[in-house]
């Protein structure tokens, strides 16, 4: 039998194996199809569920319950939540407690609950306080525990001015309880046997008792008498603020209450809405129901009768020693040196400011609490009718703004846009340079005039090149830029205490500070050309100009009789003073040499050096000083002449020390104030100074103005004996 031949049994085996393999492949294929169908169906159901619009969206809960919070599970706003219901914990489901901030450690957990939880907590405490108050003995004093105010017909008798000296001292707001004073006003003790004769006529007199817990008064809450932490006191809707806790919402609302409407409402509105206290212990609180009324017409008087804070600027000073008793010397600092201020509306006792010696006190108007006679005089005052008592004027924030409280110079009401409307013509710099040239030729010697002329001639081509392409509109715009920049600089000059002066590129004074006028004696009106210039001090060897010149005859350029006139003829001029008139000869030459380098050089460069400023002296003042010095030198000996000179110069030499170079160095206290600055340069008419100046350019890159800051060196040369 050949190897390729098979038996029948082998053929049967091969057939069976082929059928098994085919069945196995069919089974595997069917399993794959079933798995694929299941996966497809699952994906379809998932996609259908994801796109189902009727599926409720999961809402983020404001606060999880305690069980879900510990298990880090998703919770809902409803109580009990769904998870606690499924687990059978619905009876123990309550809001979880969050970690408190540091400033809330002293707050109870119930008060930090969101929504109405804090209100319920306050009501439960109120019920407990009522229950405790109803158990008091009849002879015990009663307490008013309402944070809000109810009608005066239901309020008990309250003696606002006790007669006992000890009680007065206890109720007085002294300096010892400023640091530890609570923002919540203390409860007022009311005795049943208290007489109503000591009541102020402005206080309502009623004989009704305090409402009990069983019969509460309308709008009554059981807390402190004047509790600023009560949101109903300022119409705070804590639920609408969407805060997580009561204290955060109250703080936010109080800040908004303090920041809105400051100084915009008259005292009849602001004082009545927020509660005000007068200096005689009376005030007004406008209320409707249990909260403050926003409308002044709906306000009803509650407990106090005066509206608004009295004028504390016109009240006689209070005797602080009698007010605080024998401990008046222990008060730190002098209260009269501190600014006047009012405390923010936190409590009635806090209306008195600890920094004011005339601030209104809660107890009385101006009564002294140390002497018994004063107390008796105050008692007799209560019997005087209200119409005969002196009415204190009412002051409001707008009125305080109009009063002169020595707050310094205010910002002017000038509008910057008015500059662009007022400037119609360009400024004539050519005439200014002609006037400067005439002044230099008249004052300085030929050698010094030549040095100044060389410095100006070096920058003259640059001026011509930059201005030859400018038309009239460009020159007007240049002047508008100058005036706008000067308008901005005037605020800086008034704000800083450094002697400052601003001038044009011609050297004409355009702005000057008050300190510069005090230092040099030049009035602002004279420097700006608004008043005639009668100065005769040119810084010569004698320090004075007698009216004749050593240059011989000279006729200045006939520019204008009003703009420039020789000071030898004593004719007033209306042109602004040149910067060269404020400096001595050497300082003027040095200035123009530095100006030639800086005018078209470094745009942000500056020059810092020393100079001598000339004091403003008229001919009459110079003659008096010269005559006094001549008489002292001729008729007196050396010691008498020295004493006469010291008397003439005032306190010029008091306490001053001299060095080996014949100069007097001033002490810090000797030149303090305006009087000390006026003494500088009294003898020779010169003030030794160091100054720093810079050049500001306009949009055409042309020097526009010169800003100069001056500082005194406190060195005064001694006159020769």
UniProtKB/Swiss-Prot annotation:
Ribonucleoprotein as UniProt keyword: no
Transmembrane segments: none
InterPro entries: ERT1_acuK_gluconeogen_tf (IPR050335), PAS_13 (IPR056751), Zn2-C6_fun-type_DNA-bd_sf (IPR036864), Zn2Cys6_DnaBD (IPR001138)
Domain of life where this protein originates: Eukaryota
UniProt GO BP: cellular response to starvation; gluconeogenesis
Predominant place of localization: nucleus
Entry keywords, A to Z: Activator, DNA-binding, Gluconeogenesis, Metal-binding, Nucleus, Transcription, Transcription regulation, Zinc
Any one Pfam family match given in the protein's UniProt record, by short name: PAS_13
Low complexity: compositionally biased ranges: 380-399, 543-553
Protein name: Transcription activator of gluconeogenesis ARB_05058
Source species of the chain: Arthroderma benhamiae (strain ATCC MYA-4681 / CBS 112371) (Trichophyton mentagrophytes)
């Amino acid at each position: 039998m050949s190897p390729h031949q098979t038996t029948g049994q082998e053929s049967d085996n091969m057939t069976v194996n082929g059928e098994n393999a085919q069945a196995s492949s069919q089974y595997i294929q069917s399993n794959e199809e079933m798995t694929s169908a299941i996966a497809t169906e699952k994906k379809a159901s998932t996609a259908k569920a994801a796109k189902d619009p009727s599926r409720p969206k999961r809402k983020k809960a404001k606060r999880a319950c305690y069980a879900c919070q510990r298990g880090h599970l998703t919770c809902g706003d409803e109580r009990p939540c769904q998870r606690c219901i499924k687990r059978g914990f619905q009876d123990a489901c309550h809001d979880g407690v969050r970690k408190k901030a540091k400033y809330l450690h002293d707050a109870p957990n119930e008060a930090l609950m969101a929504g109405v939880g804090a209100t319920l907590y306050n009501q439960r405490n109120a019920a407990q306080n009522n229950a405790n108050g109803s158990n008091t003995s009849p002879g015990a004093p009663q307490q008013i525990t309402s944070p809000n105010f109810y009608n005066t017909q239901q309020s008990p008798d309250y003696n606002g001015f006790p007669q006992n000296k000890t009680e007065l001292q206890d109720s007085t707001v002294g300096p010892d309880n400023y640091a530890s004073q609570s923002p919540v006003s203390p409860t007022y003790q009311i005795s049943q046997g208290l007489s109503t004769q000591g009541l102020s006529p402005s206080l309502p007199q009623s004989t009704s008792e305090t409402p009990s817990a069983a019969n509460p008064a309308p709008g009554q809450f059981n807390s402190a008498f004047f509790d600023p932490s009560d949101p109903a006191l300022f119409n705070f809707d804590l639920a609408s603020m969407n805060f997580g806790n009561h204290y955060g919402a109250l703080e936010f609302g109080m800040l908004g209450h303090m920041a809105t409407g400051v100084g915009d409402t008259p005292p009849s509105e602001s004082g009545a809405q927020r509660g005000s206290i007068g200096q005689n212990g009376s005030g007004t609180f406008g209320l409707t129901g249990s909260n403050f009324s926003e409308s002044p017409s709906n306000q009803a008087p509650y407990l106090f009768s005066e509206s608004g804070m009295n004028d504390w600027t016109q009240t006689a000073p209070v005797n602080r020693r009698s007010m605080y008793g024998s401990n008046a010397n222990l008060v730190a600092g002098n209260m009269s040196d501190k600014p006047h201020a009012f405390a923010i509306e936190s409590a009635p006792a806090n209306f008195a400011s600890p920094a004011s010696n005339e601030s209104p006190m809660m107890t009385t108007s101006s009564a002294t609490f140390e002497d018994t006679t004063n107390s008796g005089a105050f008692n007799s005052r209560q019997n005087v009718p209200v119409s005969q008592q002196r009415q204190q004027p009412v002051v409001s924030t707008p009125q305080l703004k109009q009063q002169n409280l020595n707050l310094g110079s205010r910002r002017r009401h000038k509008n910057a846009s008015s500059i662009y409307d007022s400037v119609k013509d360009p400024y004539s710099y050519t005439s200014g340079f002609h006037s400067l040239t005439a002044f230099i030729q008249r004052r300085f010697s030929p050698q010094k005039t030549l040095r100044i002329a060389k410095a100006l001639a070096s920058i003259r081509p640059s001026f011509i090149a930059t201005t030859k392409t400018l038309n009239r509109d460009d020159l007007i715009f240049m002047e508008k830029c100058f005036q706008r920049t000067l308008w901005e600089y005037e605020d800086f000059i008034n704000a800083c205490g450094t002697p400052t002066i601003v001038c044009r590129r011609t050297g004409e004074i355009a702005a000057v500070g008050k300190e510069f006028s005090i230092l040099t004696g030049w009035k602002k009106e004279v420097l700006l050309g608004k008043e005639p210039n009668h100065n005769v001090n040119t810084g010569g060897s004698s320090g004075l100009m007698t009216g004749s010149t050593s240059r011989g005859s000279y006729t200045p350029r006939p520019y204008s009789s009003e703009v420039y006139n020789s000071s030898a003829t004593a004719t007033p001029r209306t042109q602004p003073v040149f910067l060269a008139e404020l400096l001595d000869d050497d300082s003027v030459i040095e200035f123009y040499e530095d100006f030639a380098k800086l005018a078209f050089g470094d745009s942000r460069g500056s020059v810092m050096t020393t100079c001598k400023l000339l004091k403003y002296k008229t001919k009459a003042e110079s003659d008096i000083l010269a005559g006094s010095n001549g008489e002292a030198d001729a008729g007196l000996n050396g010691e008498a002449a020295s004493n006469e000179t010291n008397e003439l110069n005032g306190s010029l030499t008091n306490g001053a020390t001299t060095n080996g170079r014949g100069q007097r160095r001033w002490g810090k206290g000797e030149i303090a104030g305006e009087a000390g600055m006026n003494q500088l340069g009294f003898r020779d008419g010169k003030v030794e100074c160091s100054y720093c100046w810079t050049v500001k350019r306009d949009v055409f890159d042309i020097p526009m103005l010169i800003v100069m800051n001056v500082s005194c060196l406190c060195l005064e040369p001694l006159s020769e004996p």
